[in-house]
Design a protein with these regions (language model features):
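Membrane-embedded beta-barrel scaffold of Gram-negative outer-membrane proteins
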Residues: 20-80, 87
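Gram-negative outer-membrane beta-barrel transporters
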Residues: 42-53, 72-156, 187, 198
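Outer-membrane beta-barrel translocator/channel fold
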Residues: 1-23, 32, 36-38, 52-57, ...
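C-terminal beta-signal and adjacent terminal beta-strands/loops
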Residues: 98, 151-158, 166-168, 177-223
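Hydrophobic, lipid-facing positions within transmembrane beta-strands of outer-membrane proteins
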Residues: 13-15, 23-27, 45, 70, ...
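Short sequence motifs at beta-strands and strand-loop junctions characteristic
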Residues: 17-23, 39, 74-80, 124-129, ...
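Outer-membrane beta-barrel proteins
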Residues: 29-37, 45, 86-92, 140-142, ...
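Extracellular loop and loop/strand-boundary signature of outer-membrane beta-barrel proteins
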Residues: 9-17, 67-74, 116-122, 159-165, ...
C-alpha cells in the first residue's frame, strides 16, 4: 500500500497512487558455523534467488528539471535477482577479533507494461544491475576499527535506457574508530568517522552531488 507521504507529501505525493500487487518466487540457501575456539571462530554463507512480478509498482520519479520528484505507478515490472552474503570472524590473538563481510546483489528490474513503449523491457530508473559492499571490522577489548566499501553499478535516470540517460557507477569508502568506556553501571562510547575517505565525486541521484570527504565525531552515553 502507498504510504501517507507517497500520497500527500508536498510537491512529491500523488493522491492517485494505486497499491502494488506482487507475485513472488524465491529459493534460498543458508549455512552458519560457529566454534568456541580456534583461529576461525565463525563463518556463514547465504544465497537467495528470486523472480517477482509486480503490478502498479510504486516508484519515485523525477519531473521537470529533476529538482522535484513525484511518486507514480509503473504498470508491470518483472524483477529477477540474486543476493549473496558471506562473512567470517578470525581470532588471531587473544581478545582480537577480525570480521569480514561481503554482500553482492544482481537485480534486473524491467518494465514489461506495453510492447509498444520505447522503454519496453528496459531497466527501470535508478535500479542498478550490480551492487555490493565489503566491511572489515577489528575489535580489541574496548576498541574497534571499521572499514566499509560500497559499490553501486551503472543505472539509468529515465525510463529509456539510452546513452543520454546513463548514470555512471559510484563507490565510496568509509572508516571509523571507536572506544567504549564503563563506569560502574554506566557506559559511554566515543566514535570518529571519516566518510568518503578518498573524496570521490559521485551522484546517487542525477544533479544531486554527494559530499566529499567529511568527518563526524559522536559521543554517546547509556544510563
Amino acid at each position: 500500500m502507498p504510504t501517507f507521504n507517497d500520497l500527500y507529501y508536498a510537491d512529491m505525493g500523488n493522491s492517485q497512487l494505486r497499491p502494488e500487487y506482487t507475485t513472488q518466487y524465491n529459493i534460498g540457501f543458508a549455512y552458519d558455523s560457529r566454534r568456541s575456539r580456534g583461529f576461525l571462530t565463525e563463518w556463514s554463507l547465504h544465497a537467495d534467488a528470486y523472480r517477482n512480478f509486480v503490478r502498479d509498482k510504486i516508484v519515485a520519479y523525477p519531473k521537470g528539471a529533476q529538482f522535484r520528484w513525484t511518486m507514480l505507478n509503473l504498470g508491470r515490472v518483472r524483477i529477477t535477482g540474486i543476493d549473496l552474503t558471506g562473512s567470517l570472524t578470525l581470532n588471531p590473538l587473544r581478545d582480537l577479533y577480525i570480521t569480514g563481510k561481503l554482500q553482492y546483489t544482481y537485480q534486473e528490474a524491467i518494465d514489461v507494461t506495453n510492447p509498444a513503449d520505447t522503454y519496453y523491457r528496459d531497466q527501470i530508473p535508478y535500479i542498478p544491475w550490480h551492487s555490493g559492499s565489503a566491511i572489515v571490522q577489528a575489535t580489541w577489548r574496548s576498541w574497534s576499527l571499521n572499514y566499509s566499501f560500497i559499490y553501486t553499478g551503472e543505472r539509468y535516470n529515465q525510463q529509456e535506457n539510452i546513452v543520454y540517460n546513463h548514470t555512471q557507477p559510484w563507490y565510496t569508502s568509509d572508516i571509523s574508530i571507536a572506544r567504549s568506556f564503563r563506569w560502574s553501571r554506566y557506559s559511554a562510547k566515543v566514535q570518529l568517522e571519516v566518510n568518503n575517505l578518498f573524496s570521490q565525486d559521485y551522484d546517487v541521484i542525477l544533479n544531486y552531488p554527494m559530499p566529499k570527504r567529511n568527518y563526524r565525531l559522536t559521543l554517546s552515553f547509556e544510563l
